[in-house]
């Protein structure tokens, strides 16, 4: 099973407490989270920790990826220094445990 980018955006919004499932996410909040999702994915591809498609995130990667994106997005919402930053390393460590040798060859970084 997998989750979509929209589901990841909602998970990050809930993690940062800037979104509640019973309300619609504002376009501004969505745009700020989406920017962090794009940057996190690019970084993880470069570090060979991303082996999934942009809109087909393996279910087992959802929590670590949420932690990573929240760590990158927290400053955009005035949440720096509240512990979210630790999620980046924690999430990367979890993704490294999840990947298999065949996973890491699926996506390659784009050359500059």
Model-derived segments and their meaning:
Residues 1-58, 103-112:
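Conserved short "hinge" loops at termini or chain/domain junctions
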